[in-house]
Regions:
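Glycine-rich beta-alpha junction loops
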Residues: 18-20, 39-44, 66-68, 93-97, ...
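Short glycine/serine/threonine-biased micro-segments
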Residues: 17, 56, 61, 175-176, ...
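NAD(P)-dependent Rossmann-like dehydrogenase/reductase catalytic/cofactor-binding core
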Residues: 71, 81, 131-211
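Short amphipathic alpha-helical interaction/hinge segments
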Residues: 46, 113-114, 164, 168
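Internal alpha-helical scaffold of NAD(P)-dependent oxidoreductase catalytic cores
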Residues: 5-6, 28-34, 49-151
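Rossmann-like NAD(P)(H) cofactor-binding subdomain of soluble oxidoreductases
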Residues: 1-51
Length: 211
C-alpha cells in the first residue's frame, strides 16, 4: 500500500520475498499482468548493522505462468543484461518457486532451531531434520500438482554444501537479531496445505512449534 501511488500502467513488479504467496498478493493488488514471478537464489548473505557480506552472490530466477504474456519478462531480462546482473529462466517458474520453498523450509527453519550455520546443518541430526522437512514439502507439492523429485532435493543439498561453513541462512540471522521470522511462509504454508490434502507434516509441525 505504501508504494501504490508509484505503480502505473507500465510498472513491472517482482518480489524477491521467499515463499509462494507474494506473487498472488501482488497480482490481486496491482493486476497479474504487472507481476513477473521471481526467485532470489543461491546466495549466502550475512547482515551486520547496515552492512551485508555476500558470497556467493547468487542470481534471480524469473518467469511468468504458462499462457501469460512474456513481454514484461523480456523487457526485464533486457534491463538485467544491460546492467550485467545474473539471472536464469526456468522452464516452469511455478515449479521452481516450490523447489526454493522446499530448501528454505528445510535449511532456514532447521538453522533457526538448532542455532547453527551451514556447517551445523551438515551434522547428522540437523541434516535429518532439514531433509525430512524438505521431503514433507515435496509430498505437499506433489499433491498440489507440482512434480518435485528427490533429485531436486539432493540438488539443493549439494548447493548448500558449497556454502561457507560459517555462513548463516537468513532465519538464523533473524533469530540472533530477535526479528520476526518467515515461519508462516515456510512451515505455516506446508502445515496448512498438508492438512487440506491429508498429508502428515510431523517435522514441520515440530519446527513450527519450536520457532
Amino acid at each position: 500500500e505504501t508504494c501504490r501511488h508509484l505503480v502505473g500502467p507500465d510498472t513491472t513488479i517482482i518480489s524477491v520475498l521467499n515463499g509462494i504467496t507474494s506473487e498472488e498478493v501482488l497480482s490481486q493488488a496491482f493486476g497479474s499482468e504487472k507481476v513477473v514471478w521471481c526467485v532470489a537464489q543461491k546466495m549466502s548473505a550475512v547482515k551486520v548493522g547496515n552492512q551485508a557480506t555476500i558470497s556467493p552472490f547468487g542470481d534471480l530466477a524469473l518467469g511468468v505462468p504458462a499462457g501469460a504474456d512474456p513481454a514484461r519478462l523480456h523487457a526485464l531480462t533486457a534491463l538485467l543484461d544491460r546492467i550485467h546482473m545474473d539471472y536464469e529462466l526456468p522452464e516452469d517458474i511455478r515449479r521452481h518457486m516450490w523447489s526454493k520453498l522446499m530448501v528454505n523450509t528445510g535449511c532456514n527453519q532447521t538453522a533457526m532451531v538448532f542455532e547453527c550455520g551451514y556447517g551445523g546443518l551438515r551434522q547428522p541430526e540437523a541434516k535429518r531434520i532439514m531433509v525430512g522437512a524438505m521431503r514433507e514439502v515435496m509430498a505437499v507439492a506433489n499433491a498440489q500438482g507440482i512434480p518435485l523429485t528427490e533429485e531436486d532435493l539432493q540438488g539443493w543439498v549439494h548447493v548448500m554444501e558449497e556454502f561457507p561453513a560459517d555462513g548463516e541462512p537468513s532465519m538464523r540471522q533473524d533469530g540472533k537479531a530477535h526479528r520476526k521470522s518467515e515461519v508462516e511462509l515456510f512451515s505455516g504454508t506446508i502445515r496448512r496445505l498438508g492438512a487440506i490434502h491429508h498429508i502428515p507434516t510431523p517435522i514441520n509441525d515440530w519446527l513450527y512449534r519450536k520457532i
